[in-house]
A protein has these predicted regions:
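Hydrophobic helical h-region of N-terminal Sec-dependent signal peptides
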Residues: 14-19
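Bacterial N-terminal signal peptides that target proteins for export
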Residues: 2-13
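The canonical Cys-X-X-Cys-His
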Residues: 123-134
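C-terminal motif of bacterial Sec signal peptides marking the signal peptidase cleavage site
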Residues: 21-23
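Inter-heme linker and motif-flanking segments adjacent to c-type heme-binding CXXCH motifs
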Residues: 133-141
Length: 142
């Protein structure tokens, strides 16, 4: 009888060990976008932002601006270096993007469509200057 109890206890121990070890294994798949794919997301926000500003729909432009800026934030975190960039993306953001984004944000808060349009044009020009600086053959359009 004692041997039978040991076998049962051994099986329980084995079962618990298998369950424990299988719970430790996580095979999570993460989608990792490269810079080009992330820029495509950014482009969608940027183009729609321009459409809303041109139409004078500043409330809609506001959430698009925040979405676009959140994509910029992710790019700053993710691309501290990249083969297409001479430095971290955050330096380009700070030098080129921060001012037009602040300008558009302020214009939206003040409900100033003219200033929002000026900020948007500045944003597009800064995007294109960054592309030229890094020999990227893609233009951002108004």
């Amino acid at each position: 009888m004692r041997r039978k109890e040991c076998i049962v206890n051994y099986r329980h121990l084995l079962l618990v060990a298998v369950i424990f070890l299988s719970s430790c294994y996580h095979d999570e798949v993460y989608t990792i976008k490269d810079l080009d794919e992330t820029m495509i997301d950014l482009r969608a926000y940027q183009e729609n932002l321009g459409d809303e500003v041109k139409a004078g729909k500043l409330q809609d432009a506001g959430w698009l601006l925040e979405g676009m800026d959140s994509v910029f934030t992710e790019i700053k975190k993710k691309f501290k270096e990249h083969r297409k960039l001479d430095g971290p993306f955050s330096s380009y953001y700070n030098i080129k993007m921060k001012k037009p984004i602040r300008m558009i944000r302020q214009a939206i808060e003040d409900r100033d469509t003219s200033l929002a349009m000026s900020g948007y044009k500045l944003l597009v020009n800064k995007c294109n200057s960054c592309h030229r600086d890094n020999n990227i053959d893609k233009d951002v359009n108004f």
